[in-house]
Structures are given as C-alpha cells and as structure tokens.
Amino acid sequence: MIYKFKVFFALIFLFPNLYSETLSVMTFNVQNLFDTTNDPYKDDKAFLPIKEKLSEKHKKECNKIYVKSWRLECLYLDWNQKTKDAKLNNIFKNIISFGESGPDLIALQEVENNNILRQLFFLLKPYGYIDYKLLENNDKRGIDNAFISKYKIFNPKLHYVKFSSKFQRNDTRPIFEATLKINESMIRIYNAHFPSNYY
C-alpha cells in the first residue's frame, strides 16, 4: 500500500533570538489515520475490521454514503491490525526520510485520536521526538489535527472558524495552535485542515 503526502512546507525558520539554530517543519496529511476500535462518538465505521462490518445495520449506514468510493470503503475495507500497522509504518518511513532523522516539527492532518497518534509517536521516538499533541474537535468524521515535535509543546488550543449565515456550513475544522520553546524563544505554530467540498 502506498500513501501519498504533500510537504506544503519544509521550511527553515530563522529567528534572531535563536542565534544560528534552525527549525525544520513538515506538514503531512496522513489521509484517515484511524485505529481499529469502534468509537460510538465518531463516524469511524469505514475503519473497522471486516468482521465488525457484517451486520445489516452497518451495511444500511454505509449505503447512505453519497460518494461511491467512500461507500465501498465503508462496506468492504478490512481495517484490521495488519492494515493499520502497514499504514503507520509507511507514514513513519516517509517522515524519517526527511533529512537525516526527520523534521523537527510535524503538523499532521486527519488523525482520529490520541491512541493512534501515540502509536506513531512511539515509532518516531528513537529519532529524537519528545512530545505530541492532539485536541479533539467537532468534526463529524472525527478527524483531527496533531503535532509531533522534537521540542516540548505548550499551550495547545483550538480556534473555531465562524462564518456569516450566508456561508455557514454543516461543519468546519478548527485551527490548532500550540507553542514551542526553542532556547529562550516561544514560537507559536498553527495547523489548519479545511473540509472538502463534500461537506
């Protein structure tokens, strides 16, 4: 299985207070990184082992999905431990291929929860990563933004986007803000992932 990602920026930031230190940043849409556990508070029905997809209730819910590829995924994808681990390992390999040991900061999109984020973090930990953060938001599919970092992460918070009634949508995803401390400098970082036209 091959998972594509885009590095929208792998930038080096230079700050006067950091002397000559640099910070490398990667942003990575991991495209539905789910664990294998059914969460009744999230729409994760596509990302379950096939043995949990056999009920008529599950099939009925899947058949309500408008987009054909998503509907088939909900019905037939066997999201088991082996499948999930293969995806995690592909993401891990892509991250550490950046530079010698991965970027200093990774901004991730489409992560289900802290459980699956923690699994990715422990794969990366031997490469100098020390912290990770994810805050649950109100996205109806249950996917969140997250950070994994070689620096300590402070003050995580979500900024919800408010629209006028003319442009209001059923849901939107908040912007995830956090702060890194590098030497004596506090640097704010932001992670945004906006809904597709299907929502």
Language model region names:
Residues 4-6, 87, 173:
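Basic side chains
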Residues 37, 168-169, 199:
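A short, polar/proline- and glycine-enriched secondary-structure boundary/capping micro-motif
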Residues 9, 16-17, 41, 116-119, ...:
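Residues in flexible loops and secondary-structure boundaries
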